[in-house]
Amino acid sequence: MSSRPHPGSERPLHGPRQRFDLGTVVGRLMEEGAWQRGQRNSITLRKGEGMNVVLLVMKAGDRLEEHAALAPLSLSVREGRIRFVAEEEIVEAESDTLLTCDAGVRHTVVALSDAVCLLTIAG
């Protein structure tokens, strides 16, 4: 496993302490080509040592097809609105909402508006 997020990056993926200015990181994601072409974009902020953290920006209507994580997860909606469907339960979540689910729970995420989410996966 690499300790860097992208080839040539100076930012380590884990360490004893890390700090992120999420507003700045979101701004960078929205400047990148994927977002400009109407696609979702993401960056792994931390990976390893028992915790993976991904910042995700989604366009309205974007969808993460049904899948399951191998470990428990939390999804914090920072901006916008999403629909989270897990095991027949539908939850519409907006800014300042935290959702969690256990390992192996199949789920789908749909952006109801442009959205910013912070995904944390244990393990």
Segments (PLM) and residue ranges:
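Glycine- and acidic-residue-biased ligand/ion/polar-headgroup-sensing regions
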Residues: 60, 71-87
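Ligand-binding loop in jelly-roll beta-barrel domains
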Residues: 92, 103-123
